[in-house]
Structure formats: C-alpha cells, structure tokens
Amino acid sequence: MVKIEVDEAVEFVAGLPETRLVLLCDHAANRLPPAYGALGLAAKEFERHIAYDIGAREVTLGLAARLGGFAVMTRHSRLLIDPNRGLDDPTLIMALSDGVIVPGNAAIDEAEKRNRIARYHAPYHARIAETLDAMTGVGTAPLIVSLHSFTPSWKGKSRPWHAGILWDQDGRIARPMIELLRAEPGLVVGDNEPYSGALDGDTLSRHGTLRGIAHVLVEVRQDLIARKSGVDEWVERLARVIEPFMKDGTNAQPEAAMDDAIKTAIEATAFRRLIAHLRQRSDVQNIDLMNLAGFCRNCLANWLAEAAGAELSRDEARRMVYGMAYEEWKAKHQTEASATQKAAFEKSHKH
C-alpha cells in the first residue's frame, strides 16, 4: 500500500528520490466535480474509455508500491478536460467523443475553458514539474513512465496487441523496453501502436521531450487490467522491465565531452522549449527574429544545462545559445548606440 495525497485536481504518491522513477497517469479517474453533474451524459458512459483509461490508475499505484516511485495522477475525467493535450489542441475539451455527444461541453465559452484549465489541467502539470524539479535540483536524472490503457477493438476491428510502447524522439527507454517485453512468450507488443507517441503539446512532450528527460508511454489493453488479477500480473511484468532503467543510469550525461550530434540534440530541445515559452508570452508576439538568440538568453542557458542532464557552465551554455563566446556576442550585438542612432530613435518614437 502507498499513501496517496489528494487535492482538488491531483492524486500524488511521494516516492523515494533514489528510485528516480516518476509515474504518470493522465486519465486515472472517471469522476466529475459535483458542480458539473454528469455533463448531460448517462451514467454508463463514465464506465467507458471516453471517460478514463480503465485499469491505468491501479497499475500506476501498483508500480509505485512495487518500485517505490513517485506517482502523479489526475482526479477527474478526461471528459471535463484532457490533461494529455496542449492548450491549443482542439480535443482539449471534447464536445463529441467516440460518437457520443457531450452536452455539457457543447457550447462552453472561453471563460469556462480558462476556468477548467486553471483548476483541473494546470495543477496536474504543475505537480509533475515540481516533482521533476525536485529531482533535477539535486542532480538526480528522473525517468518518466506514463501509464494508459486502450480498448480491445476500435471501429469494429480487433486490436492484436497486449501492450503498446509509445514514444516520439527519445528512444532511450522505449526501444529496449519493447525488446524486453517481446522476449516474453506469446506477448504481442506494439511499437507506437495502437497510437503514435508523437503528439505535440501532450504530457510527455511537455515534461519529457522539452526537458530532455528520458520517458516512455505504456499502453496496456483494457481487458487485461480490468480485474485485480490482471492488474497484479501487469504490475509485476512492467516492474521487471522498468527496474533495469532505474539502475543503469539512463538519462545521465556521459563523462566524455559532448560530440556535435549530442550538442545539436540539446540545442533542438532548448529551442523547442523556447517556442513553448514564447507561446505563453503575450508581450513578444511581434518579436524581431533577428534578436531571437538574445531574447530570454538566460532561460535558454538554463534549459540547455537541464536538457544535457549534467552541469554545464553558464559560459558554455551561453556559447551554445549564441553560437560564439558571450563576449564576442556582446561586442557584435550589444554595442552602445551612437548619438545619431539615439537621435533617430527619439525622432521615430515622438507622438
């Protein structure tokens, strides 16, 4: 048994930092806050996949107990708002889900959308970020494992997989985990099946890809974990394939100097994070792209260090941001304006 901390939007299990393991469950619950009633739906709809991932919460808690990891889980149905979607994703709040009209979502205004984001979406992601920050802040490289489940059939077609391993750009956990699971006799394991792991703005994109943290999404077929016996079986199976990554230092930066390919990957991570950062900034919509390398340069330097999984000196991180030594960048791009330039500026800003 594990102790579960509960607040309005999140269930949280405080694990052991030395495990490095952070378990996530985006679609853990099928409940709604009382103020929303049933969103106009029949009770039976909340027992279906459109409301939550059947069995995923139980597997998450089982793994937290078995491996000593942290766990962050949602407390409300994805029908209210989907935590595994970016804020600009049209499926963030579904008016129609698998052929079912959701009356309570059909005509919500921007104010209600912002309310749901603030109360039920943002706190979940904040708790994930806090958990990861606590680890990286003391030099621990986290491992993120996100637990989901999928239906045995879709649109009348059976799905042959017992489980699927989903991933986007980071295969540090996914590739070897697929091999480990496929080594078990009779087990059919999908590689980015039944879904693709590439979803811009989803939970793992936000907390894994953009931060350079090793991560993987595990989908288990719902009928296999609908009962306790199945949950127990899959907890043991997944624990066996997760444990090696907890012990082998996955996500740690090698001691050797980074080669150009690694630097490029880190730079790409930092700039993807910059894009997400700029989307949140209403004051930089018309930013001059010629000044992009100089804008938020301290943030970029910090993100580069974080993405590397090891300490980078501030000067080295800045050099990677600017493409040259900081002093050289200042000499080229932060020169004092001449008297003529200042006069022209004053003239152009007179009303």
Model-identified regions with their sequence ranges:
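Domain-level signature for proteins that mediate thiol-based redox and metal-cofactor handling
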Residues: 257-351
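N-terminal catalytic or cofactor-binding beta/alpha core of small enzyme domains
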Residues: 1-144, 149-256
